[in-house]
Structure formats: C-alpha cells, structure tokens
Amino acid sequence: ASFAEAPPGDKDVGGKIFKTKCAZCHTVZLGAGHKQGPNLNGLFGRQSGTTAGYSYSAANKNKAVLWABBTLYDYLLNPKKYIPGTKMVFPGLKKPQDRADLIAYLKHATA
C-alpha cells in the first residue's frame, strides 16, 4: 500500500519509535552531527546520499531519491529492498501505522 493509503500519523508516537529504533544511529537536531547514520535535519526535499560530511554508500548516492512522505514510507518498509547496497542495517517497519507515525515525527523534528 502507498503513503496515500496510509493511516494518519501521530508525531508523539513517532517520536517514541524514533527513540527506540532510530536514535542509536541517527540525530535529527540541526548541527547535531552524524552517528553511524547521517543526521536527518532537513531530510524532506533532500536527495538521498547528499548530507554534507557523511560517507554514503554508492547505492544511496546513485539512487538519487528525493525524500518525501511517499518515498520515506516505501523506504522504511524495507530499506535494503528500496536501496540495494545501502549501509543502513535497519530491517524496516512492517506496520503502516508505525511508518506513518515515524514520518509525522520526522516532518516535525527535522524541519
């Protein structure tokens, strides 16, 4: 199912998902720096593999996806299927509600 068919996201629930599943490798605050994964500030509208100061896989750079609600929704289902060769080891979020909640949080936290 596509993002257009996704349930409404809850940013507060999404924040909890971020803390438990994403924060080990990612930061969202402006200038927070990179961890194992890149800082996600300014994520929406940015092309994959272009965050300054982070060493991306060739796969991530070459995919050249523009991050938006719909592309993140598909990516977060199964990152390694969406971008074969990505360094991201996270297996994905299978539940549409979890992905919608996380995206709602990211839209708020990375703006």
UniProtKB/Swiss-Prot annotation:
Name the record gives this protein: Cytochrome c
Residue positions, PTM N6,N6,N6-trimethyllysine: 80, 94
GO CC term (a single one): mitochondrial intermembrane space
Keywords associated with the record: Acetylation, Electron transport, Heme, Iron, Metal-binding, Methylation, Mitochondrion, Respiratory chain, Transport
GO molecular function, a single term: heme binding
The protein's role, per its UniProt record: Electron carrier protein. The oxidized form of the cytochrome c heme group can accept an electron from the heme group of the cytochrome c1 subunit of cytochrome reductase. Cytochrome c then transfers this electron to the cytochrome oxidase complex, the final protein carrier in the mitochondrial electron-transport chain.
Organism whose genome encodes this protein: Pastinaca sativa (Wild parsnip)
Location of N-acetylalanine modifications: 1
